[in-house]
Amino acid sequence: MATAASNPYSILSSSSLVHADSAGMQQGSPFRNPQKLLQSDYLQGVPSNGHPLGHHWVTSLSDGGPWSSTLATSPLDQPDVKPGREDLQLGAIIHHRSPHVAHHSPHTNHPNAWGASPAPNSSITNSGQPLNVYSQPGFTVSGMLEHGGLTPPPAAASTQSLHPVLREPPDHGELGSHHCQDHSDEETPTSDELEQFAKQFKQRRIKLGFTQADVGLALGTLYGNVFSQTTICRFEALQLSFKNMCKLKPLLNKWLEEADSSTGSPTSIDKIAAQGRKRKKRTSIEVSVKGVLETHFLKCPKPAAQEISSLADSLQLEKEVVRVWFCNRRQKEKRMTPPGDQQPHEVYSHTVKTDASCHDL
């Protein structure tokens, strides 16, 4: 006994003693895997083979004795990390509080480990992730693993266990969406069609003599949607979004049909236009006519009334239209000319002093 007490490692290094006790330890319940045996015997001080070896168990395993060589390999090929004294003290507190849960040891499922359990008590899942649960005699957790939900159920089982309302239904909406999309594509105009319609609408509106404000007011009275002059202007300039262009196109098309059918007779559109803003219709001048007027403006920015009348007759325009155009052109020239510079009519007044046709109206 003195020799055994003085040299406890000789007891652990004896292979015959290990093999002799292994059969008995597999049958008896007090012996479990090495780490559990270390923790329980270290805490309770229960002699395992007649010798109080609480501290010597820790020292022998941490120094890499014969048992550590048999437990060095792991099915996951993980490094063999032995717990220190502080870890064992922490494990003691957890062991007293909850006998079911403790720190995971990589040697739990080793084939050579003592008291190795079959598959139901395995602490490693199919995905290779370890669980922080190991089995203990008297505190079995096999029922907890099987019925408590610690092991995640298969994907098929979890899907079947869901309520029919919570299950993800088969995506039948894609076929319907494609069908509706094909149907809507037949009615939705393309960008080229919208551009062509906007161009034709502007030409026919000017030809009929309606302003953009008249069109917006007529749409509000006839169809219940009031549109401003800015909206009609942006439609003609293709500055609206594609969605709004598609919504506005059928309304403007109906307005054109109504306006074409009512040409020459006072209809609701004419009455609506008369009830609108009391102002003269905006006059549109062609590019060629503007070129002729620009040429005359460079020669004489302030033409006489007789010259305005002859110019209006030659261009087939009203006299008032020509007069207003020259007035607007002079105002534009003032805005474009920096202060201090001579304006065109001042330059011409110095060069042509005897021209009687150039004087103020």
Swiss-Prot record:
Q: What is its main location?
A: nucleus
Where is each POU-specific domain found?
A: 186-260
Q: What is the scientific name of the source organism?
A: Mesocricetus auratus
A GO molecular-function annotation: DNA-binding transcription factor activity, RNA polymerase II-specific
Q: Where is the composition biased (Polar residues)?
A: 119-131
Q: Which GO terms describe its cellular component?
A: nucleoplasm
Which InterPro entries does the UniProt entry name for this protein?
HD (IPR001356), Homeobox_CS (IPR017970), Homeodomain-like_sf (IPR009057), Lambda_DNA-bd_dom_sf (IPR010982), POU (IPR013847), POU_dom (IPR000327), POU_domain_TF (IPR050255), TF_POU_3 (IPR016362)
Give the span(s) annotated as Disordered.
99-131, 144-192, 334-361
Skewed-composition ranges (Basic and acidic residues):
165-183, 343-361
Return one Gene Ontology term, BP aspect: negative regulation of mesenchymal cell apoptotic process
Q: PANTHER family, from UniProt?
A: POU DOMAIN, POU DOMAIN, CLASS 3, TRANSCRIPTION FACTOR 4
Q: Where are the transmembrane segments?
A: none
**Residues that bear Phosphoserine:** S265
The answer to whether UniProt assigns keyword Lipid biosynthesis to this entry is: no
Q: Which SMART domains match?
A: HOX, POU
What this protein is reported to do is described as: Probable transcription factor which exert its primary action widely during early neural development and in a very limited set of neurons in the mature brain.
Q: Which Gene3D superfamilies match?
A: Homeodomain-like, lambda repressor-like DNA-binding domains
What family does the database annotate? Belongs to the POU transcription factor family. Class-3 subfamily.
Keywords for this protein: DNA-binding, Homeobox, Nucleus, Phosphoprotein, Transcription, Transcription regulation
Q: Where in the cell is it found?
A: Nucleus
Where does this protein have coiled-coil stretches?
Answer: none
The protein here is known as POU domain, class 3, transcription factor 4
Identify one Pfam family in the record: Pou
